């Protein structure tokens, strides 16, 4: 019988799809990484999502964030992506927490997650979220820095001890090591970020090509 997740079922099997449908994933940070993550999870058949972000869609988000449209500027990012997830799968259970994750208020952000996606920018909050998940036995993956990088084919999933070419990885690795943690799963790119001169050259090339 045809259903929205038939292709996933064909690829992964009925048991795996059933497991996904009963899984609860939390995404912290609904920006350039988090918004696309939410979409992939919803389209992949995950049955329950919690979306955490206190920000609203701005004009500068239009170039890279799935939640950003002319019609959504000024709206909460978590709320926009929650509605989009429901448009994909009306049966999905999606909850928004429109707040800023921080150590002093961490308890209100946790609730029976099977997996957590860390797409937070601020290092102190990022590290606290990682530590909080580890203490609770919740699997977590962290997105690291991709600013001013342009080759998506270089993205890697790795242990943080194996990362290179990422300033954010260096800082997070140091902070975790100070807390006795040496292993953590991350998504990173070893590509060196473009310098301002390179960015300007790219913009000029794009402008010339358009002419």
Task: Enumerate the predicted regions with their spans.
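Conserved SAM/SAH-binding loop
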Residues: 98-104
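Conserved S-adenosyl-L-methionine
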Residues: 43-48
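A charged, well-structured terminal subsegment
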Residues: 173-203
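N-terminal charged helix/coil linker that caps or initiates catalytic domains
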Residues: 1-26
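Hydrophobic/small residue at the entry helix of a nucleotide-binding pocket
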Residues: 33
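ADP-ribose/adenylate-binding Rossmann-like module
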Residues: 115-120, 128-158
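Glycine-rich phosphate-binding loop and adjoining beta1-alpha1-beta2 segment
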Residues: 53-88
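Conserved small/polar residues in nucleotide/adenosyl-binding loops
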Residues: 205-211
């Amino acid at each position: 019988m045809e259903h929205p997740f038939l292709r996933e079922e064909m690829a992964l099997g009925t048991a795996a799809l059933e497991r996904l449908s009963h899984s609860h994933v939390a995404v912290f940070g609904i920006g350039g990484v988090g918004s696309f993550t939410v979409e992939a999870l919803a389209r992949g058949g995950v049955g329950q999502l919690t979306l955490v972000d206190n920000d609203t869609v701005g004009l500068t988000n239009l170039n890279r964030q799935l939640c950003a449209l002319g019609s959504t500027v000024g709206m909460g990012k978590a709320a926009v992506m929650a509605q989009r997830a429901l448009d994909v799968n009306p049966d999905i259970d999606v909850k928004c927490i429109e707040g800023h994750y921080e150590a002093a208020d961490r308890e209100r952000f946790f609730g029976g997650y099977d997996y957590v996606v860390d797409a937070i920018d601020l290092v102190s909050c990022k590290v606290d979220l990682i530590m909080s998940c580890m203490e609770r036995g919740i699997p977590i993956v962290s997105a690291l820095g991709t600013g001013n990088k342009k080759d998506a084919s270089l993205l890697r999933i790795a242990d943080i001890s194996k990362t290179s070419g990422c300033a954010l990885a260096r800082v997070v690795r140091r902070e975790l090591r100070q807390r006795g943690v040496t292993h953590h799963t991350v998504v990173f790119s070893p590509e060196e970020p473009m310098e301002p001169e390179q960015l300007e050259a790219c913009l000029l090339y794009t402008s010339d090509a358009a002419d």
